[in-house]
């Protein structure tokens, strides 16, 4: 309910305040849809604490309303796709990385042995679609559906999709930034020019040195991750 949600928010705010008074002089809140979206965040936090002792980085996981929350000044940094940031005034947009499209299958699926997936590999299979897919992914899904050579059904979100993959109900195309690299599933690159331009947004009114250092730390980690699948 709304009331219980408000109580949880207040409890979290009190706990954060206690943490802040105890150890930190500055706090940077980062809104993202899921934990794995910024895979190098833990390493960035470690590096930042060495360079800027006393700066705390607090992740906020907001699958649906991250943009709205950011615009209400409820977070300092927003992980987003570039398409989400157009026509938003008063923000700075910092390029982070480009992410490709991957096919997610069970590790025992014959397709798991392939190095690259084409449309022909997916024909005859059952594909999960929907779940708030970004524009680049929706266009690929629609192309496959229009071929008439696949079965498909809607999945409400990424976690539901993974459960369905694990239970053998279907396979799925997804952005690489959703990969948690746990090794539970096979993620195989899909042959497409479509990609997702992942960025970090900050408020133009926020000119803290610690914030600039945090953004630069993350950008460097992704720039140096040459062989890491994104």
Q: Each predicted region: which residue ranges?
A:
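Alpha-helical "hinge/linker" immediately C-terminal to small N-terminal DNA-binding modules
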Residues: 1-22
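Short coil/turn segments
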Residues: 32-38, 82-84, 101, 106-116, ...
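Hydrophobic hinge/microswitch elements
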Residues: 63-67, 71-74, 81, 132-187
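Beta-alpha-beta core module
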Residues: 88-94, 99-100, 160-209
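Secondary-structure junction motif
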Residues: 40, 119, 123-148, 211, ...
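Acidic, Gly/Pro-rich loop/turn segments at junctions of secondary structure
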Residues: 51, 63-124, 177-182
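Central regulatory/effector-binding core of bacterial HTH transcription factors
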Residues: 25-85
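Extended ligand-binding regions for polar small-molecule ligands
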Residues: 120-123, 197, 201-230
């Amino acid at each position: 309910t709304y009331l219980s949600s408000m109580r949880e928010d207040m409890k979290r705010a009190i706990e954060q305040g206690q943490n802040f008074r105890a150890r930190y002089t500055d706090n940077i809140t980062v809104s993202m849809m899921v934990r794995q979206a910024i895979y190098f965040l833990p390493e960035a936090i470690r590096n930042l604490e060495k360079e800027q002792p006393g700066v705390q980085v607090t992740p906020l996981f907001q699958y649906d309303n991250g943009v709205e929350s950011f615009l209400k000044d409820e977070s300092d940094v927003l992980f987003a796709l570039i398409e989400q940031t157009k026509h938003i005034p008063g923000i700075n947009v910092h390029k982070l990385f480009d992410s490709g499209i991957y096919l997610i299958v069970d590790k025992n699926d014959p397709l798991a042995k392939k190095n690259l997936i084409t449309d022909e590999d997916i024909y005859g299979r059952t594909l999960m679609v929907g779940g708030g897919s970004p524009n680049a992914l929706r266009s690929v899904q629609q192309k496959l559906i229009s071929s008439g050579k696949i079965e498909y059904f809607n999945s409400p979100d990424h976690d539901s999709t993974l459960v369905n993959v694990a239970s053998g109900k279907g396979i799925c195309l997804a952005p690489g930034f959703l990969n948690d690299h746990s090794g539970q599933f096979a993620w195989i690159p899909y042959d497409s020019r479509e990609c997702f331009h992942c960025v970090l947004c900050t408020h133009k009114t926020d000119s803290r040195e610690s914030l600039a250092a945090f953004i630069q730390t993350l950008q460097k980690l992704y720039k140096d991750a040459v062989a890491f699948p994104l």
